[in-house]
């Protein structure tokens, strides 16, 4: 979510907004490009947060655009598929906080507690950003916990020891 969403949120809150786009079409990171005759889709393939209570759903409702969207649900058992080439393994990533944690706990039983605590940490950290919950900022918007400020690899290492699982979670960190 980028400039258009930000502009819409500012406008919804009474600001006069002008959104500028440097490319020929609006969409920021959702553009495609062609190199050597091959077309590359660079945009997202899936967007979470649209289930009831989800942060993106609440934001779209707040902006008054939810009813205009054509949302197709993802497969509950495999919202995404990760291929870990170093080991030749495939990981089907299920929908939902608990199922996400359970799926990795099943594949990495020695890390079950760490995975659950890591997922809880991600949700705790997202709670520090008032925008995700559509609430007013409390105190300075630039004041966050020590854990919030950690690089992703250090945060993951606090909870997970297995290097393979740390690789997988680090890859997925910006997405989930």
Regions found by a protein language model. Give the residues of each.
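N-terminal glycine-rich phosphate/pyrophosphate-binding loop and immediately adjacent elements
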Residues: 1-121
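Rossmann-like flavin
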Residues: 86-176
């Amino acid at each position: 979510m980028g400039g258009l969403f930000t502009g819409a949120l500012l406008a919804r809150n009474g600001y006069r907004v002008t959104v500028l786009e440097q490319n020929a079409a609006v969409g920021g990171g959702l553009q495609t490009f062609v190199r050597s005759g091959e077309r590359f889709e660079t945009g997202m393939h899936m967007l979470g947060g649209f289930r009831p209570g989800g942060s993106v759903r609440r934001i779209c409702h707040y902006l008054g655009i939810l009813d205009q969207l054509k949302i197709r649900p993802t497969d509950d058992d495999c919202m995404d598929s990760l291929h870990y080439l170093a080991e030749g393994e495939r990981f089907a990533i299920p929908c939902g906080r608990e199922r996400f944690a359970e799926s990795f706990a099943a594949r990495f039983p020695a890390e079950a507690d760490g995975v659950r605590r890591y997922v809880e940490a991600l949700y705790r950290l997202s709670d520090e950003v008032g925008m995700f919950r559509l609430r007013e900022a409390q105190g300075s918007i630039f004041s966050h916990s020590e854990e919030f400020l950690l690089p992703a690899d250090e945060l993951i290492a606090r909870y997970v020891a297995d290097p393979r699982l740390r690789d997988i979670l680090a890859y997925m960190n910006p997405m989930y």
